[in-house]
C-alpha cells in the first residue's frame, strides 16, 4: 500500500511537470530520476488519465519494468540451494533422531518360533555339559539356507551368518532349509527343500564384522557425511548332518613296530 501511494504521488507531480514542458522530446525524459522511491514487491497500477494523455509514458513504463537484481536466475538458484541444504540437514537430524528413538520389539513365544522358521532354523534348547555332540569328520556335505544366504557345510565346520535373534550362546539349533545333500556315492537335490534332511549346529558366539565406512556426498549442496557400520554376526559350529546314508569309514591297519623291524632285518640279511 505504501508503494501504491508513493506511485500515485509521483504520477500527480509528473502531470504538473509534463503539462509545463510538453514540447520536450521523448529521449529527454529517460534521464529523469525519481528520488525517495522504494518499489520492491507487488504490482503497480498506473494512472489511466496519464497514460491516455501521454502515450509515450506507457512505453517508458514497460521499458522500466524490471527486477532489482542482475539476474533472476541467480536468486532462484541461491534460494533452491539454501532450501536443499536445509532439507539435507533436517533429513540428517531426523535420521539420527530415529536411530536414537529406535526401540526393540517384544516377541511372543509363538512369534519367535514363526520368525525362526522363516529364517530357516529351530532352537532345540541349551547344550548340556554332559552332551558330546562333536564328532570326527564324515565325508558328507550339505547346502543349507539361512535367511538369504546359502552355505556348503560338513560336520565340524564353522560359519558366520547374520545375527540370529532368538538364540543364545551354547544353544542347539536345527537348520531346516536343506537344499542339497551329497556324499561320495550319491547326491540328493531338493525341490527346493529336502523335508527329511536336517543339519544340527551349536551357537558359539555373537560377534561384529569389520567396520565399513559409508561416505555420502551431494553435488553443489555442501553435503558430506561419513558413517561407519559393523554388521552383527552369529558363529555356528556344525555338529551333524542327517538324511543321507553315510559311507562307513575305512579302517587302515598300521603294521606294528616289531613287524617293521623284523622286515627290515630280513632285507638287510638278504
From Swiss-Prot:
Tissue expression remark: Constitutively expressed in roots, stems, leaves, flowers, pistils and siliques.
Pfam families assigned: Ribosomal_L21p
SUPFAM superfamilies in the cross-refs: L21p-like
Effect of inactivating the gene: Failure of fusion of the polar nuclei during megagametogenesis and abnormal double fertilization; fails to undergo fusion of the outer nuclear membranes.
GO MF entries: rRNA binding; structural constituent of ribosome; transcription cis-regulatory region binding
Gene Ontology cellular component annotations, sorted alphabetically: mitochondrion; plasma membrane; ribonucleoprotein complex; ribosome
Region of interest called Disordered, as start-end residue ranges on this chain: 68-113
Keyword Plastid: no
PANTHER family linked: 50S RIBOSOMAL PROTEIN L21, LARGE RIBOSOMAL SUBUNIT PROTEIN BL21M
Protein name per Swiss-Prot or TrEMBL: Large ribosomal subunit protein bL21m
Amino acid at each position: 500500500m505504501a508503494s501504491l501511494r508513493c506511485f500515485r504521488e509521483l504520477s500527480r507531480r509528473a502531470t504538473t511537470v509534463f503539462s509545463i514542458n510538453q514540447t520536450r522530446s521523448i529521449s529527454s525524459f529517460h534521464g529523469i530520476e525519481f528520488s525517495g522511491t522504494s518499489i520492491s514487491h507487488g504490482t503497480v497500477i498506473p494512472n489511466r488519465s496519464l497514460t491516455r494523455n501521454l502515450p509515450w509514458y506507457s512505453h517508458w513504463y514497460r521499458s522500466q519494468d524490471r527486477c532489482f537484481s542482475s539476474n533472476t536466475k541467480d536468486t532462484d538458484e541461491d534460494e533452491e540451494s539454501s532450501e536443499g541444504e536445509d532439507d539435507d540437514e533436517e533429513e540428517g537430524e531426523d535420521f539420527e533422531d530415529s536411530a536414537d528413538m529406535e526401540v526393540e520389539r517384544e516377541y511372543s513365544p509363538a512369534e519367535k518360533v514363526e520368525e525362526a522358521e522363516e529364517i530357516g532354523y529351530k532352537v532345540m534348547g541349551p547344550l548340556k555339559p554332559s552332551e558330546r555332540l562333536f564328532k570326527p569328520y564324515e565325508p558328507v556335505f550339505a547346502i543349507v539356507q539361512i535367511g538369504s544366504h546359502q552355505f556348503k557345510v560338513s560336520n565340524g565346520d564353522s560359519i558366520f551368518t547374520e545375527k540370529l535373534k532368538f538364540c543364545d550362546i551354547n544353544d542347539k539349533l536345527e537348520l531346516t532349509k536343506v537344499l542339497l545333500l551329497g556324499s561320495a556315492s550319491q547326491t540328493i537335490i531338493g525341490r527346493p527343500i529336502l523335508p527329511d534332511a536336517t543339519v544340527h549346529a551349536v551357537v558359539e558366539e555373537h560377534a561384529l564384522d569389520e567396520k565399513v565406512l559409508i561416505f555420502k556426498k551431494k553435488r553443489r549442496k555442501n553435503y558430506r557425511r561419513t558413517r561407519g557400520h559393523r554388521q552383527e554376526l552369529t558363529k555356528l559350529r556344525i555338529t551333524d548332518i542327517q538324511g543321507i546314508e553315510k559311507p562307513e569309514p575305512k579302517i587302515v591297519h598300521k603294521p606294528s613296530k616289531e613287524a617293521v623291524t623284523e622286515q627290515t632285518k630280513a632285507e638287510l640279511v638278504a
